Structure formats: C-alpha cells, structure tokens
C-alpha cells in the first residue's frame, strides 16, 4: 500500500486542531410537589426557558392534581442545573424561590403544620 503523505497531512492537521465540543448545559428541570396530608407526590420535568408555566397544566394529571385541584404542602427541585432559579407565584403573589442552594420550599409558610395550598392559579418560572 502506498500512502500519499500530501493527502494525510491536511487530515491530521484538522483532527489535531479540532476543539472538543462543549458539553451543553441542559435546560431541563424537575420539580416535585408533595401533599403531606394526602401522601401524594409527583415530579414533573419541563424546560427552564425563562417563561411562566401553569402549575395546574403541569400537575393536573398527577396524584397531587387528583380531583381537578392541584394541592400541595411543599415543592422541591429534584433534577436541576447548578444555576437554576425557579420562582413560584400563586394568584400573583410570590410564594418562594427554588435554587440549587435551596431545593425545598414549604408552600404554606408554616413549619408547624402541613396545610395544603390550592395551586390551580399558580405559575412557576424557571431559568438557568
């Protein structure tokens, strides 16, 4: 076999100088809602695309949305990027923020009681 060095050298130069592909950061986030009174729990994965998402639309087909009402006592990030920031609002009022440093949120604001909150009008806004 005869190798043509003139043909191989350019290919080697391209292969050596090629920069590795960057690992793309996923914009997917998984948020779970739990209801400590009923024992229901559901996690939903969606795009953290800097838009408002309806909590009712995300969770209505899950155990926390049984009976047509999404009720939960807590929210938790279960799969996320290090730069995630999710704000939960209900009826226009901010309930709280979930981040990589604060992955759990008591929705009723009471550490002494588990009071399910109706989240049918809630929105979650996540960005990376």
Regions found by a protein language model. Give the residues of each.
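Fungal secretory targeting signals
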Residues: 1-25, 128
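Mature, structured extracellular domains of secreted fungal proteins
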Residues: 19-128
């Amino acid at each position: 076999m005869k190798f043509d060095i003139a043909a191989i050298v350019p290919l080697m130069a391209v292969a050596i100088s090629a920069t590795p592909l960057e690992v793309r950061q996923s914009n997917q986030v998984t948020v779970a809602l739990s209801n400590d009174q009923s024992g229901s729990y559901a996690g939903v994965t969606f795009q953290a695309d800097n838009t408002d998402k309806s909590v009712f639309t995300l969770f209505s087909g899950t155990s926390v949305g049984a009976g047509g009402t999404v009720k939960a006592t807590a929210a938790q990030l279960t799969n996320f990027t290090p730069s995630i920031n999710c704000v939960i609002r209900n009826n226009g009022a901010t309930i709280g923020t979930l981040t990589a440093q604060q992955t759990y949120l008591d929705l009723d604001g009471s550490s002494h009681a588990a009071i399910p909150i109706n989240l049918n009008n809630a929105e979650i806004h996540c960005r990376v």
